[in-house]
């Protein structure tokens, strides 16, 4: 089963390679474990901290923030139907690391910036 969020991560990969201002604003790294409806998981790493920004499935890279979230909840955030802080407060997003840095996820998942049709 493909994850609906894959299209979002592919778009983030494109943006992080071209939008140097966004990378500078975010300045941190995330490991996101996405859980599918079938119980399978997929890991994505977003590194907007290193000199060479990276988005992909290299789970060995060191990160500052670790996030666990269901694919459907991640899509709701990307679509603007739920804010990342709401997901955290409702227990839909588990977080390990600095919460202030984790809130920079808003910049990456800004629904106004995402082109993918959800």
Curated annotation (Swiss-Prot):
Record-level GO cellular component terms: cytosol
Domain SCP2: 5-113
Gene Ontology MF terms: lipid binding
Sorted UniProt keywords: Lipid-binding, Transport
Source organism, top-level taxon: Eukaryota
Pfam families: SCP2 (PF02036)
Protein name: Non-specific lipid-transfer protein-like 1
């Amino acid at each position: 089963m493909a994850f609906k969020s894959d299209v979002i991560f592919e778009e983030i990969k494109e943006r992080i390679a071209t939008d140097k201002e966004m990378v500078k604003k975010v300045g941190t790294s995330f490991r996101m474990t996405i859980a599918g409806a079938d119980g399978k998981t997929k890991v994505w790493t977003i590194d907007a901290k290193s000199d060479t920004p990276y988005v992909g499935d290299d789970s060995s890279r060191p990160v500052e923030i670790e996030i666990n979230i269901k694919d459907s909840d991640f899509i709701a955030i990307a679509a603007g139907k739920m804010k990342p802080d709401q997901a955290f407060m409702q227990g839909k997003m588990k977080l390990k690391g600095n919460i202030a840095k984790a809130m920079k996820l808003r910049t990456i998942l800004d629904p106004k910036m995402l082109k993918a049709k959800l």
